[in-house]
Amino acid sequence: MLRDGNEGMSTIPGFSQIQFEGFCRFIDQGLTEELHKFPKIEDTDQEIEFQLFVETYQLVEPLIKERDAVYESLTYSSELYVPAGLIWKTGRDMQEQTVFIGNIPLMNSLGTSIVNGIYRIVINQILQSPGIYYRSELDHNGISVYTGTIISDWGGRSELEIDRKARIWARVSRKQKISILVLSSAMGSNLREILDNVCYPEIFLSFPNDKEKKKIGSRENAILEFYQQFACVGGDPVFSESLCKELQKKFFQQRCELGRIGRRNMNRRLNLDIPQNNTFLLPRDVLAAADHLIGMKFGMGTLDDMNHLKNKRIRSVADLLQDQFGLALVRLENAVRGTICGAIRHKLIPTPQNLVTSTPLTTTYESFFGLHPLSQVLDRTNPLTQIVHGRKSSYLGPGGLTGRTASFRIRDIHPSHYGRICPIDTSEGINVGLIGSLAIHARIGHWGSIESPFYEISERSKEVQMVYLSPSRDEYYMVAAGNSLALNWGIQEEQVVPARYRQEFLTIAWEQIHLRSIFPFQYFSIGASLIPFIEHNDANRALMSSNMQRQAVPLSRSEKCIVGTGLECQAALDSGVSAIAEHEGKIVYTDTDKIVLSGNGDTISIPLVMYQRSNKNTCMHQKPQVRRGKCIKKGQILADGAATVGGELALGKNVLVAYMPWEGYNSEDAVLISERLVYGDIYTSFHIRKYEIQTHVTSQGPERITNEIPHLEAHLLRNLDKNGIVMLGSWIETGDILVGKLTPQTAKESSYAPEDRLLRAILGIQVSTAKETCLKLPIGGRGRVIDVRWIQKKGGSSYNPEMIRVYISQKREIKVGDKVAGRHGNKGIISKILPRQDMPYLQDGTPVDMVFNPLGVPSRMNVGQIFECSLGLAGDLLDRHYRIAPFDERYEQEASRKLVFSELYSASKQTANPWVFEPECPGKSRIFDGRTGDPFEQPVIIGKSYILKLIHQVDDKIHGRSSGHYALVTQQPLRGRAKQGGQRVGEMEVWALEGFGVAHISQEMLTYKSDHIRARQEVLGTTIIGGTIPNPEDAPESFRLLVRELRSLALELNHFLVSEKNFQINRKEA
């Protein structure tokens, strides 16, 4: 936090800090906690004892670098070594060795892990916090029924409910419930202890009758009753130790372990003083919960809001990694026990290193990062996407909710989200409200809660102090909203300000305020904070904008925005795509692939990223920004990354736009653009595709990589080198061979060529045949080969020894069908590219670059794009850049409009262009039709907007099929571009054809053009000879499939075909 002249200001925390803190907490605390839980292992005769000495464990520095791990598809991990001892109790000897436990994947500087060469990230999960929660529901008679739900650390739930007679029941499943007295007795309390520990003993005494008193007379009877209700399948159980163990395993371990957080919550809610290390549910907890429930029945106490963030906890990367480490140690324990028993059985002398295997830990983490729903492949479309992905929070995942069962109340915005979870940034579709994004200043506290910073207002001290509050603490304070940040301190005593108190938004005097917000962006996520004039947009459009900025493609020539919010620099810095100087010094040498820095007597070579492919096929590239001989300081930018300029985020381009209709080409969100954007490479981007092939060892022999491929034209093999692999720099077209490969196979005698059969008969030479299994370039993949990698995994399986990867770069200009969007949810598809001379032009002759539909603004209520458009024009003419904080109306009324108009007026005066600011229609100007030169009827809003090109491109979506594969069951074309699928005539298409009465077209669409196998084959022959296509004589395959499916339901369907010649009904069997 800054002091003195900048008192009251703070720096924004690192956007990847949550991931770093979580991983450091796992390494510092989680590893040690789980290792301490590892038990001493003894054999059955208790002669050998194995134990780990966890105080001196070691994590070894990785043997490979991050770049090599990605290149060779390896895991960037550290080896874990722990001293272990094997004690022989008979001779009192101990053998101590350092054993290798396994590999733990490390986190890199981006806050991600590299597993099998793929960047993966673990996102935070929001779960219901363990503890007890009271709620009230109306029964069918309209009477309030009070229940208390106890949630364990594992997510198991048990309910306490009170009936009309004030009797309390414990419901351990949906169907079974038992008396609270039976449950307390089964947990170890007698009736006297129960009555001594409750506030309403007379109510508890009224529960049991004589039969129930017998059940709670002893602990054995209570356990039998509880077991019979909860776990018994049938018969009369008999009390035994095995019965107690089964009940302990089925019920108490799953539903009664509260954990560290649950114990804290239970103590706070029920005013208990049970020690924190006692993490299991005790009879005292149950009785206190029952007392509280009785108080609820009598109108005392408050109900709990299950959706309040104080009742939620964050399962961070530290918790998830610690859970997996504990699971791996349990597997290791079982493996060590089995190895000890096997060694003794075979009379072998074990050693610690022989007993411990690294497989459990390594395989557990590999399966976690590869299969767990919360471990996701890092989205690297652009720099913004990388940092936003690590700050996601999800209600989904193991132990959480599902998209189909979550209610609207859970998805909705809650007042406790203020400053913690962004109210705007969430996914669209079925997961809306379930996957959110953390606010900029939010952090995860020690107890798994989301904390938000506030400035404390103190009359005694003039110093401003920043405090982080959890959701349970800030309810007790009057918190002033962010608009009070700009008020003059001298007038504040007389001001009335909006504030938040106990989930309500009030307007109170300044002297009653306890805390105030620290930053106007405090409530928003990173994506929403990059939207200028966000306060003038509808929240739905702001949501779309924050999502679409993550889909922006890095352009070949990036340009920073004229109108921004000021967070562009921080976002680019924390994304890690720019090269930053770690030491001060002098630039000795600079090149496209490295920068050499000299300082303090050392020379450091800093490698740059060159044309690296992201997992969304976008191009990641670094461009040097320093010259040779220049002196730099620590933290200075050496090279810009993809979509950054001068260390600022630059996702799009500032283009001249007009809001007007144009011959219908921009109706319904279509966009008309100038050919200047194509020929000037304004929206040109590079995309890198990866194609790979593996060589296997088959039963007939190994596959061969070669350039001698029989039966293929030389034209297709023109780009292969002598090894059979495509050469670097080659231009590749669809269908060309990238890697030549032959797979050996045995052939039948009849399939041999005559000369091969002669060789076999005369000389006895075995002629080997091979099948061509080359890697060919698929449709739409044409481009330039920029990299070829031949990877041989060390110690790999002989069945998969080699892998060849070919990387092909495509240069894509903007074209009809591509999707573009602004930063205000204004998206559209390119409908037509006009010559620049036909585009509307301004009064100074400048042609417009894009034409948007003005009808897309009022109905969608995203007026922020108009402010940005006009201010961008003023900034372009004045050569200025603006950084606008949101909610600038806190300074004065209509502050945004006054700013825009004043800048337009300044631009009009300085450039001597009166059309820039016309008083009768400010922000609008008369423009001319490029085809005729005539002015349009009405003035039009023109300006400079920051427009993004999105990853939804027509080259990836357009698809056509002349012939292809058919589904085996229905005999209809497959579905989807990836399978070379086609269209099929469905139910609604048939209705459309029937509506026009086109009987013959309907027949051919449903028979030989679709799934009639025999008629489909006859079409080709009759077309070649020029005959007429015969009408099919039987039913198509889909109808036959319907008949068979009805038969499987024991329904026989007979059908009849009517002949055209004599209208005679002929019965046919399907």
From Swiss-Prot:
It catalyses: RNA(n) + a ribonucleoside 5'-triphosphate = RNA(n+1) + diphosphate. Gene3D superfamilies: 2.40.50.100, 2.40.50.150, 3.90.1100.10, DNA-directed RNA polymerase, beta subunit, external 1 domain, DNA-directed RNA polymerase, subunit 2, domain 6, RNA polymerase alpha subunit dimerisation domain, RNA polymerase Rpb2, domain 2. It comes from the Eukaryota. Keywords: Chloroplast, DNA-directed RNA polymerase, Nucleotidyltransferase, Plastid, Transcription, Transferase. InterPro entries: DNA-dir_RNA_pol_bsu_ext_1_sf, DNA-dir_RNA_pol_su2, DNA-dir_RNAP_su2_dom, DNA-dir_RNAP_su2_hyb_sf, RNA_pol_bsu_bac, RNA_pol_bsu_CS, RNA_pol_Rpb2_2, RNA_pol_Rpb2_2_sf. NCBIfam families: PRK00405.1. This is DNA-directed RNA polymerase subunit beta. Its EC number is 2.7.7.6. DNA-dependent RNA polymerase catalyzes the transcription of DNA into RNA using the four ribonucleoside triphosphates as substrates. It is found in: Plastid, Chloroplast. Disulfide bonds: none annotated. One of its GO terms (molecular function) is DNA binding. The keyword DNA-binding does not apply. In plastids the minimal PEP RNA polymerase catalytic core is composed of four subunits: alpha, beta, beta', and beta''. When a (nuclear-encoded) sigma factor is associated with the core the holoenzyme is formed, which can initiate transcription. One of its GO terms (cellular component) is mitochondrion. Its main location: plastid. PROSITE patterns: RNA_POL_BETA. The gene is rpoB. CDD domains: RNA_pol_B_RPB2 (cd00653). The keyword Transferase applies. GO terms for biological process: DNA-templated transcription. Belongs to the RNA polymerase beta chain family.
